[in-house]
């Protein structure tokens, strides 16, 4: 019988549930996002002569507030809680994510100090990005003293992507965070005030190779989804234990792990996915290079640790051999090539590649010590790197005012600018892993975790690579303090308040983390809870014991 009216029809009851958006827990991300949006509005409606001061204050206040909110959330997170999931379990708030966000925000604030520095009325960025290098339009903008203040909202969106990248709880959210982080950086790399063609070439290379790696990452997600039927990390982990949706589907998982690994290893900059780093680091504005070499590396490794320790935590035997090979190639190849470099920014780029290999030894360990060791290493390396690039911005060619990249021009710097030379020497010693610096504690932590996991051959390669890298670090120190100043000696600028603060922050962090690492390792970096039960204690030594799922 066909019902004659709606009253005779029984409709199903539909229950809808609003998403669990805890704005307080998401506040560090929301503050940075709001600053980026407001910055765009400022560019649209505020007169050009007032934008610099407004954008600088807005960006620094937003990052500072987000950092304080992150610290408050660390203290408010219950001691017996692994963490919380928000927004349909797409975002996670746990101790590792809060730690990585705090480090990223601190490094972003230090980089913003370099970005905001102006010398003789000029910043490190071109006056008009759309101008063709060498054109009349560009010269007009240079003569007018134009400031490209759009860099501030772009930096805010990049920092937002870095934060979300480390807090994503599924692959789709992580991919979105990857693009939010990467797209602004592609633009920022092409905005250098000097050597415009070189800067735009670096941006183009970074964009093309970045798009290539993103495609690998996305195809890997598709493969994992075909195997697990889900993109949530917890569901992928469960599928790895149970065998997936279909019999014989393990090749899908292995291909997915490999392709996702390629996408993430590109962002980290390991061999053989490192070729973009030297060109981009050299061509990009140095303040942006500082942000990429520190914040982006922290974000990429933070995301990698979550993916391999949580989503692929039950398939360690499948992905560990791949990372073994990549780590060895990265440490050996990058260390050898770095010895031949004659440009300071390219040398620091290859140094970054080598350090990525060192951190990979902690990832390979796949235990809680590896996680905490990698976290300490990333924090220590980040502050040292920002300080080193801050000094690079101060050493200029006497003829055109561009940065003095050739290492021969740094000869005798210890005589003309002893404070800057001593600061850079300290940073180089930290990169080399000399005792009483943060680099020594970081290397000791990651190598100790690798030895405990049975990766002693990997540690041997790491120690030998450290010896090779120490050669070119010490070579620069000898050049600065014991060589005669070059005929084309550079003009060393007096550090402004902003740049001086960045250098001082780097020096303080390098010494404090090297001399007093205990407070950071015990109170800042999360540790597995102490348990009396042997079974529970064994569980807490697992690589994923500190992550929320």
From Swiss-Prot:
<feature type="transmembrane region" description="Helical">
    <location>
        <begin position="466"/>
        <end position="486"/>
    </location>
</feature>
<feature type="transmembrane region" description="Helical">
    <location>
        <begin position="496"/>
        <end position="516"/>
    </location>
</feature>
<protein>
    <recommendedName>
        <fullName>NADH-quinone oxidoreductase subunit N</fullName>
        <ecNumber>7.1.1.-</ecNumber>
    </recommendedName>
</protein>
<feature type="transmembrane region" description="Helical">
    <location>
        <begin position="375"/>
        <end position="395"/>
    </location>
</feature>
<comment type="subunit">
    <text>NDH-1 is composed of 14 different subunits. Subunits NuoA, H, J, K, L, M, N constitute the membrane sector of the complex.</text>
</comment>
<feature type="transmembrane region" description="Helical">
    <location>
        <begin position="57"/>
        <end position="77"/>
    </location>
</feature>
<dbReference type="GO" id="GO:0050136">
    <property type="term" value="F:NADH:ubiquinone reductase (non-electrogenic) activity"/>
</dbReference>
<keyword id="KW-0472">Membrane</keyword>
<keyword id="KW-0812">Transmembrane</keyword>
<feature type="transmembrane region" description="Helical">
    <location>
        <begin position="321"/>
        <end position="341"/>
    </location>
</feature>
<feature type="transmembrane region" description="Helical">
    <location>
        <begin position="171"/>
        <end position="191"/>
    </location>
</feature>
<dbReference type="GO" id="GO:0048038">
    <property type="term" value="F:quinone binding"/>
</dbReference>
<feature type="transmembrane region" description="Helical">
    <location>
        <begin position="421"/>
        <end position="441"/>
    </location>
</feature>
<dbReference type="GO" id="GO:0005886">
    <property type="term" value="C:plasma membrane"/>
</dbReference>
<dbReference type="GO" id="GO:0042773">
    <property type="term" value="P:ATP synthesis coupled electron transport"/>
</dbReference>
<dbReference type="GO" id="GO:0008137">
    <property type="term" value="F:NADH dehydrogenase (ubiquinone) activity"/>
</dbReference>
<feature type="transmembrane region" description="Helical">
    <location>
        <begin position="347"/>
        <end position="367"/>
    </location>
</feature>
<dbReference type="Pfam" id="PF00361">
    <property type="entry name" value="Proton_antipo_M"/>
</dbReference>
<feature type="transmembrane region" description="Helical">
    <location>
        <begin position="297"/>
        <end position="317"/>
    </location>
</feature>
<feature type="transmembrane region" description="Helical">
    <location>
        <begin position="206"/>
        <end position="226"/>
    </location>
</feature>
<comment type="similarity">
    <text>Belongs to the complex I subunit 2 family.</text>
</comment>
<feature type="transmembrane region" description="Helical">
    <location>
        <begin position="148"/>
        <end position="168"/>
    </location>
</feature>
<keyword id="KW-0874">Quinone</keyword>
<comment type="function">
    <text>NDH-1 shuttles electrons from NADH, via FMN and iron-sulfur (Fe-S) centers, to quinones in the respiratory chain. The immediate electron acceptor for the enzyme in this species is believed to be a menaquinone. Couples the redox reaction to proton translocation (for every two electrons transferred, four hydrogen ions are translocated across the cytoplasmic membrane), and thus conserves the redox energy in a proton gradient.</text>
</comment>
<dbReference type="InterPro" id="IPR001750">
    <property type="entry name" value="ND/Mrp_TM"/>
</dbReference>
<keyword id="KW-0813">Transport</keyword>
<keyword id="KW-0520">NAD</keyword>
<feature type="transmembrane region" description="Helical">
    <location>
        <begin position="96"/>
        <end position="116"/>
    </location>
</feature>
<keyword id="KW-1003">Cell membrane</keyword>
<keyword id="KW-1278">Translocase</keyword>
<dbReference type="InterPro" id="IPR010096">
    <property type="entry name" value="NADH-Q_OxRdtase_suN/2"/>
</dbReference>
<keyword id="KW-1133">Transmembrane helix</keyword>
<feature type="transmembrane region" description="Helical">
    <location>
        <begin position="26"/>
        <end position="46"/>
    </location>
</feature>
<feature type="transmembrane region" description="Helical">
    <location>
        <begin position="253"/>
        <end position="273"/>
    </location>
</feature>
């Amino acid at each position: 019988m066909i019902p004659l009216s709606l009253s005779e029809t029984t409709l199903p009851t539909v229950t809808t549930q609003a998403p669990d958006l805890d704005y307080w827990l998401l506040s560090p991300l929301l503050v940075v996002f709001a600053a980026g949006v407001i910055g765009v509005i400022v560019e649209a409606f505020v007169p050009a002569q007032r934008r610099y001061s407004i954008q600088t204050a807005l960006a620094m206040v937003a990052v500072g507030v987000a950092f304080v909110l992150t610290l408050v959330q660390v203290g408010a997170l219950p001691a017996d809680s692994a963490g919380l999931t928000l927004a349909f379990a797409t975002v996670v708030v746990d101790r590792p994510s809060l730690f990585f966000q705090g480090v990223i925000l601190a490094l972003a604030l230090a980089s913003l100090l370099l970005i905001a520095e102006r010398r003789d009325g000029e910043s490190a960025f071109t006056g008009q990005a759309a101008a063709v290098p060498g054109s009349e339009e560009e010269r007009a903008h240079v003569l007018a003293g134009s400031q490209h203040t759009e860099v501030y909202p772009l930096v805010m969106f990049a920092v937002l992507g870095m934060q979300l990248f480390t807090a994503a709880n599924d692959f789709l959210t992580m991919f979105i965070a990857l693009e939010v982080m990467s797209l602004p950086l592609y633009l920022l790399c092409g905005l250098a005030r000097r050597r415009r063609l070189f800067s735009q070439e670096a941006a183009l290379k970074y964009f093309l190779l970045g798009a290539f790696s993103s495609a690998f990452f996305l195809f890997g997600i598709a493969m994992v989804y075909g195997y697990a039927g889900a993109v949530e990390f917890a569901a992928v982990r469960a599928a790895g234990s149970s065998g997936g949706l279909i019999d014989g589907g393990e090749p899908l998982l292995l291909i997915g792990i490999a392709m996702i690994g390629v996408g993430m290893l590109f962002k980290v900059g390991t061999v053989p996915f490192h070729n973009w780093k030297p060109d981009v680091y050299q061509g990009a504005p140095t303040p942006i290079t500082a942000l990429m070499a520190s914040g982006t590396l922290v974000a990429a490794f933070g995301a990698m640790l979550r993916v391999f320790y949580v989503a692929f935590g039950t398939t360690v035997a499948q992905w560990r051999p791949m990372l073994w090979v990549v780590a060895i190639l990265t440490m050996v190849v990058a260390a050898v090539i770095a010895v031949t470099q004659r440009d300071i920014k390219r040398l620091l780029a290859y140094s970054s590649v080598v350090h990525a290999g060192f951190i990979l030894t902690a990832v390979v360990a796949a235990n809680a010590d590896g996680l905490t060791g990698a976290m300490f290493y990333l924090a220590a390396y980040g502050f040292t790197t920002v300080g080193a690039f801050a000094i690079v911005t101060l050493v200029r060619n006497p003829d055109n005012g561009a940065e003095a990249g050739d290492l021969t021009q740094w000869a005798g710097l210890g005589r003309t600018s002893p404070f800057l030379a001593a600061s850079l020497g300290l940073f180089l010693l930290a990169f080399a892993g000399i005792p009483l610096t943060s680099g020594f504690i970081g290397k000791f932590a990651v190598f100790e975790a690798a030895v405990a996991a049975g990766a002693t051959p990997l540690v041997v390669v790491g120690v030998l690579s450290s010896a090779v890298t120490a050669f070119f670090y010490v070579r620069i120190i000898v050049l600065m303090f014991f060589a005669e100043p070059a005929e084309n000696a550079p003009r060393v600028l007096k550090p402004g308040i902003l740049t001086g603060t960045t250098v001082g922050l780097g020096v303080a962090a390098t010494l404090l983390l090297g001399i007093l690492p205990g407070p950071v390792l015990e109170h800042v970096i999360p540790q597995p809870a102490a348990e009396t039960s042997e079974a529970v204690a064994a569980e807490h030594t697992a690589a994923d014991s500190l992550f929320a799922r």
